[in-house]
Amino acid sequence: MDYILYTYQIEDYHFEMFLQYSLRPLDIQVEVLKIKESWCAILDEAKCKIGNYASRISHFEHFVVLSYYYQGLGEAAISVLNEIKETKLVAGIEHFNMIDNYEMLCCPANLVIASRVKDLASSYKNNLISVEQLEEYIQISALTVDEIIYLYSRLLFPSEFMQLAINDDCNDAQIKKTLLNMYQNIDNQKASLVIAWQMLNKYTRLPKIAWL
């Protein structure tokens, strides 16, 4: 009683099916204020950790560039979040990590109740869907203006970098390699964000980040 047994059987699957499920609205809502408070706390903690790292990471100027860039993105994301009119957003069954992998997509420990656009934003950021597919999902799911604003703010918020800065040793060789890959991908990421902004701006007026 009150337990569910999950078993795994590797089989053919379609990633789009999981994304469609994540967009189905639940009879639950998430508070925008709590999202903002969470992001502010993450940003503050990351800034503190970054300050500690900056004084002892030698010969790794990429880290300094990344830290300023991603802190700027985080602050921009919170600023966009302030454009949302409603106090709550519709929730869906989302994933902590949205990866095109059957076991990860089905793993109960990887599921979370959050705004129903979380997986959609992660899929675009991780290059799992194109901007054309992103727009199709927006139309099919009939996202509200506030959900579109939140979607854009999620695209901006640098969760991956913040998680590395907070939870990992940025002096570690493997982490440095990951950070270097991020640094080398900045231009592509900027272009992807601009393309998304141009598309989303057709549905509602979104603030433009001048330095992107």
Where are these regions (language model features)?
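ATP-binding pocket architecture of kinase catalytic cores
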Residues: M1-E31
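ATP-dependent phospho-/nucleotidyl transfer catalytic cores
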Residues: I4-Y6, E31-I93, L206-A210
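Alpha-helical structural elements of signaling/regulatory helical domains
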Residues: D27, E31, S55-S58, H62, ...
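Short, mixed-charge aromatic SLiMs
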Residues: S38-A46, I140-E147, K177-A191
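Active-site acidic catalytic loop and adjacent metal/ATP-binding pocket
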Residues: Y70, I78-L120
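Active-site Asp-x-Gly
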Residues: Y102-I149
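Central hydrophobic cores of alpha-helical transmembrane segments
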Residues: Y150-F157
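ATP/Mg2+ or Mg2+-diphosphate-binding catalytic cores
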Residues: M162-L212
